[in-house]
Amino acid sequence: MDSLRPADWPGESFCYTIRNQTDLKNERNPQMTHNENEFQGFFAEFFDMLHEGCEDAEQYVSLLGTYGKKILELGSGTGRIVIPLAKAGFQVTGIEFESDMISLMEKKDYPRDRLHVVQADARHFSLDERFDVILLSCNFLNHFADAADVASILSCCRDHLEPDGCVIIDSSVPDTDYMVRSNGEEEVLTFATENGSEIRDYFKPCYDFLNQVENDTIRLQEWKDGVLIREACTEERLTWYYPREIRSLVREAGLRVDWESSALCTKEDRPPISVDSENMIFCCKHT
């Protein structure tokens, strides 16, 4: 599961522009508007289109070759990481909670004998096998604000690791400057799709800095030829972890940090996590 936060959008998959809200027809049709989970329905489709072709999938393919062939990803979504891994020859299992995300993945072309997805809650999963690598990629942990939930997730990961296996946690370093600038401000982005329609994304983050919580209000509209085709609204709640917190959570789960870096790359090229880093990667093993 990834966030729909603008700072995380790659931009390669869509032609998009940022416009002021006053530049757009901010029309709403109450009969068409409905609330959705941020990983269901319209939002699941938007997520899938938005993250298609992200470069981190190929980075994982390159990185994981030295760690073994059995891979588990928590929050595998519509398959943007697990499918490239399966195509590269890895034996891959995904855990995904949302059925709409799984349905979108199953429509894609991938080797069925090397990838299967289990619909389950990552906080309490139990599989009858162990893995060489377990991935918590793309801000997966940020969707769990309760420390007890994170502890349960990491404990489940520990119990499903091979003796020399590793858990890889991939999260964004909190961008406090962006948070301060954007707090309470609605941003509107427009995306031109392949079928000639335009998706308008109205995104408003509100930050609770004391508790490191982000509450987002998101509204999606799809327009074609000046007509509003569909509209959906959602709210998401995220939390943001700093490196010291990740290290502590890992240690409390009975794991240790084997290495950490600000980029997904081989040992020789790993840059350290610093104040200028956008990402933080932790490779964790049994104690």
What are these regions (language model features)?
Residues 75-77:
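Class I SAM-dependent methyltransferase "Motif I" SAM/SAH-binding loop
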Residues 123-133:
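A short acidic, Gly/Pro-enriched loop at the edge of an enzyme's catalytic core
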Residues 132-148:
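A short SAM/SAH-binding and catalytic strip from SAM-dependent methyltransferases
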Residues 151-163:
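A short glycine-rich, Lys/Arg-flanked "PGG" loop and its adjoining helix->strand segment in the class I
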Residues 26-69:
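Conserved class I S-adenosyl-L-methionine
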Residues 80-124:
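Class I SAM-dependent methyltransferase SAM/SAH-binding core
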Residues 237-287:
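C-terminal lobe and adjacent flexible extensions of AdoMet/dcAdoMet transferase-like proteins
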